[in-house]
Amino acid sequence: MKKSKKSKKSNTWKIKQHRDQFFKKSKSLGYRSRAAFKLIELNEKFKFIKKDTYLLDIGAAPGGWSQVASKIITQGKIMSLDIKKMEEIKNVSFFQCNFLENKTQDRILALFGNKADVVLSDMAADTTGNKSLDCIRTNQLCAEVIEFSTQILQSKGVLISKLFMGEDFLEVKELAGEKFKKVQFFK
C-alpha cells in the first residue's frame, strides 16, 4: 500500500517536532546541541565515560558531547578539536584545527600516546545538497577516525562515531570490524 503525500508530510512534521523538542530541551538544560542527549543515552547504557577517562572529541563544535563528558570526567583528560571555533568548556582543552592534517594527528599522539579510553567523532562533511555525495564524504571522515583511533586507544578503548547509511556504509562497517573486537550501530 502506497502512503499518501499527506501521510508523508505528517511524518516529516512529527520528526521535525521531535527534533525540535530535543533542541528546546537541550537549550533549557544548557547544552549546546541536542547531540548531548545521544551521548548521555549511550553512556547510561554502556558506562564507557568515567571520572578518570582520557577522551578525544573530534568534530566537537559546538561542544555538546564535550559538555557531557566534562560533567563526568573529573580526574582524566578531555581534548576537543574542530575546524570551527568552540566556546570554552571547563576542564576541556580545545584546539581549532583540521583533524585530517598530519600535524594535528601528531599533536594528538603526543598528548595521548596510546592511552585514550574514548574517541568521539561527530564530524560531518560540509553539505553540498547532494545527499549521496554528502553521505560518502562524511563516511570517509568516519573511516579516517577509525584508522587513527587504533593508534591512540587502549586495548579496551571505545570509539563512538557518526556514520550514515549509504552506498559505502558496508565498507566502513567492514573496516570497523577489522579494527575493533566489537562493533554496534545505534540510531
Where are these regions (language model features)?
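Conserved SAM-binding loop of SAM-dependent methyltransferases across substrates and taxa
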Residues: P62-T74
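Short beta-strand "acidic-cap" motif of Rossmann-like dinucleotide-binding folds
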Residues: I78-S80
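Class I SAM-dependent methyltransferase Rossmann-like catalytic core
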Residues: M1-K51
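Conserved class I S-adenosyl-L-methionine
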Residues: K51-A61
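C-terminal substrate-binding/active-site "lid" region of AdoMet-derived donor-dependent transferases
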Residues: L56, I89-V92, T104, V119, ...
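Helix-to-beta-strand junctions that scaffold the AdoMet/dcAdoMet cofactor pocket
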Residues: K50, I73-T74, L153-Q154
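S-adenosyl-L-methionine
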Residues: I83-T128
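Glycine-centered, small-residue-biased loops immediately flanking beta-strands
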Residues: T53, G76, G157
